[in-house]
Amino acid sequence: MRPFVLMFSLLMPASAALAAAPPHALPSPPAVDAQMQRLMRETQAQGLALAVIDDGKVAQVHAAGKRNAAGEPLQPDTIMYAASLTKAAFAYMVLQLVDDGMLDLDLPIAAYLDRPLPDYPADKRYAPWPDLKDDPRWQQITPRMLLSHRSGFSNFAFLEPEGKLRLHFDPGTRYAYSGEGLILLQFVLEQGVGLDVGREMQRRVFDRLGMTRTSMTWRADFAGNLADGWTQDGSTEPHDERSRVRAAGSMDTTITDIARLAAALVSGKGLSPASRRELVRAQWPITTASQFPTLQDELPPAKRRADLAAGLGVVVFDGPQGHGFYKGGHDDAVGNTMVCLERGQRCVVILGNDVRAEAAFPALVRYVLGDTAVPWTWEYGNKVFVP
């Protein structure tokens, strides 16, 4: 099936282009199309969408393959599940609140609440906060810790024995990926600061960036062109029409829209210089062999990757082309990634409505951006990648 491709002209003075150009030459749109098709054949992935950002602007948008079992084509405006790329979008919104003086990254969350966190009744929109009634360490948690995955929580309470929420380590003392931590920050913003996170995301992120087909909850107008998914064994899974705003991962989007978000993150559009620096600054070292399981033992210092660290809503790293950041998104039938390099303000964003596409991510990102040193084995563990 012939892939769709959009290309945007990038106009800038020749002197500026020479000054900012990274060493790797970006491949042409037809070359990217061909590489996508090759890797889809290698992985058996049924659908794949990709965007390229250059100089902080959207340069290419591609979509190839199918959006559903009926064989309807995946298009640049097809609704796809963003999964945990939502976390990066949420962090972008939170930093705008910081810029507006509505939130302090280092003020404990207890200062924003009108009662102790465990005194709030259980609510299916959030986590079971009453489970923390015998552990006062929750009072140490700050928004910065939550955005950099240092809350002390597991990924989600429902994964715990008996489904009980608990702190596994003193907040702020190590990295452990936690969707529940992002949900806690959402709770603080809604119950403590008095904001509607869904509305703030719409106003501060989607409307600001022209992301017209992106939402934190399902919209009826998405139904005409949405992507179902394929699991690792090749079975299909229908698109989930999510009805609740979840900072950890409820966002639906398109490759065209998510490209605009990546461009804003890498260029700093919408953020003060100070907040943009915080987004991609190494907040805390990552000390485990892989992202999952989230509470695995830390590696001995000599075996840790020294440049790998938590940013705010993203993971940061250093490689042959300098400083970069990335965020992944995963579900049983979804594989997504966003990789950005500070030098040249370049990104590749990939949305796959087939989880098998993840095996192609290192090759595809390398083809577009060159060698980046993205920590693929930390992100995906022992997954076998195609060359």
Where do the language-model regions lie?
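Bacterial N-terminal signal peptides
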Residues: 5-16
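Active-site SXXK
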Residues: 33, 50, 56, 79-109, ...
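Short, gly/Ser/Thr-rich active-site loops of penicillin-recognizing serine hydrolases
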Residues: 282-299, 354-387
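Short, conserved catalytic-motif segment at the N-terminal edge
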Residues: 25-81, 102-104, 124-126, 159-168, ...
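Short, surface-exposed loop or secondary-structure junction motifs
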Residues: 68, 120-325
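Acidic helix-start/capping segments at beta-turn-to-alpha-helix junctions
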Residues: 53-55, 106-121, 127-129, 282
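Short, well-ordered beta-strand elements
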Residues: 60, 324-327, 335-354
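Boundary at the C-terminal end of the N-terminal hydrophobic targeting segment
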Residues: 16-20, 25
